[in-house]
Amino acid sequence: MTNPSTKNTGVSSGEQLASDASPASPPSPRPPGAHLSRRTVVTATGASALAAGLTGASVAPATALSPAVAPLTAPAAAPPGTDPTAYTTVARAIAVYDEHDRPLVPTYLKAVENGLPARRGRATKRVLVVGAGPAGLLAADLLNRAGHDVVVIEANGNRVGGRIKTFRKGGHEEGEQPFADPGQYAEAGAMRLPGSHPLLMALIKKLGLELQEFYLVDVAVDDPKKQANRAWIHVNGVHMRRADYEKNPAKINDTFGVTGPNRTRTAAAILAQALEPAHRLIRGKEGTALVKGWAKVLKKYGHWSMYRYLTEVARLDTRTIDLIGTIQNLTSRLHLSFTHSFLSSALIDPKTTFWEIKGGTALLADALYKPVKGKVRLDRRAVRIERRAGKVRVHTVSEDSQTGKGGVTEVFEGDEAIITVPFSGLRHVTFEPPLSYGKRRAITELHYDAATKVLLEFSQRWWEFTEAQWKEALNSIEDKLYDKYRAGAVDDGAYLGAHESVKKLGVTLPDELKKSFAAFRPVAGGDPDAAHVRGGGNVSDNANRFMYFEHAHPMEGCDGGIVLASYSWSDDALKWDSFADDERYLRALAGVQAVFGRRCEVFFTNKCKTQSWMRDHYAYGEASVLLPGQHTELFPDVPTSEGPLHFAGDHTSIKPAWIEGALESAVRAALTVHTG
């Protein structure tokens, strides 16, 4: 199956994102002395794909507030004191090359598929793995199969997987039923898996997990091979199908005040053209030439924010940047590193096929956990790591011991350790003796960003309805109710959860909730036409920002489905994080109604879930999304070993927020321990 060919719906993070030739990721962020602000202040993916990049783009045209001049191609030099070797180091990390500019992916693939190489005549080691996310679990499995004595130490008391987390019933964590329909599940974390990530694809195949296509772009309900492009763009009071926007961009662009040639160009096309100066430095290159190309990108733009690049290189005015930020999901990260958004934008591409694991991404965590389950110690949070007399000691506490009301403390000893805890979490771990200055600085300063999801359950997949199906469903509740909604004549919350399919799930919504919801509902108005789509993402400038339909493929035995009502990052996410979980759901439903119409409320079950990764005290944020300059100032010290201490996790790769980055780091660390 191939992804429908159409414009992309946004620039990603997470996932935790590029050609088949090499891995890629984005996958979900102050120069010295600079004021850290939204507009003055992007960490990467596989480079070969980006070298292929976007083609056919030309110099950015003049805009309302900028002259018709070519983009600048020679920004100011990097700040004094920047280590010149850092550019090459990071360039190789982007390309996943060794010090001789040879690809590392083939070696990593062999390890994933066949295990670590034989170690003739060398003693086995006792290895402590701190953290049971995908990096920790894979590293532990590889070392365990190679004959080493492995212990995995995990702070969470009931599950493994890190930011691979599925709201589901059962699983290794024995989760309670999260939704009214016992067959439903939804992703709190990683949800879309790029086919261009070779280690992940190989691992999934090896583990025998079933994939189905994740429709980043919506497809026809009756023919999933046919693109629909009927997803909504709802900004500045304009309601428009994406296909219509591509035919007539001016209708939305005018609302931002965009003039000149860009008035009639889509936000995606404007962004692609804006990134062309950077793409020219890497396009068509490989080996040492590719490394040199990436080093040039980093020297020219690595100390810049995305906003600075768009204004000073692409010469876009603020109105056009506002357009791009809103439609392409860049607004909340304009102040972060240009590098991150540059790489991310090239990965979220119509030519990239995305997949999801049938049954939930947590099935991957289950499969990684199974062979090392007896080696994993849950409910053991590392608080102190010592190196003494040739040994590593990890001091841990149970979660309840942190309240001062008892609990358990335990010390684990080994020859070496692989530490996969996010650096934001290591800020609260004591090292004795102290780590190197570069490592300590990275732990202190590495920027972690926020990401928040709000997921709502509905008893029917109303987004797939035709108008005829809407009419039948609504009139089954009350005669001519369909006409009332279409005319905007329903001005209270009386019909919240009113459809019989909600009651069949054992749900009856209280009148108090309906009265409360009336205050959140959008102002009465005629409902828009039926969405009639499967999968895809919708854009809004309301607090929800981006909306996706979970599990585009119908689930056997389930009539309803889950809507990712809000998927937001950075500042957008923090505005949701201020609310308690239960306070988010009616607000998110109102945001969905503003885009799709109020009638969807009749299928609302009020069985909802939400995940804030910044508030998660195991994750400490969505991912390391770096600030300008941090790739060359901090990253070279992130993955390096400190004696018997080795570091892994997606933050130690140039694929933060993506499982592929975690897997790359796991193999790297396991090989270091095994062959050292």
Regions found by a protein language model. Name each.
Residues 115-270:
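N-terminal glycine-rich phosphate/pyrophosphate-binding loop and immediately adjacent elements
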Residues 2-126:
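Extreme N-terminal leader/targeting segments of oxidoreductases
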Residues 439-466:
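Central beta-strand plus flanking loop segment that forms part of the substrate or channel wall
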Residues 71-114, 146, 391, 429, ...:
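Conserved flavin/dinucleotide-binding core of flavoenzymes
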Residues 78-87, 98, 186, 205-206, ...:
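Mobile amphipathic helical/loop "lid" adjacent to a hydrophobic cofactor/ligand pocket
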Residues 405-416:
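Core beta-strand elements of the Rossmann-like FAD/NAD(P) dinucleotide-binding domain
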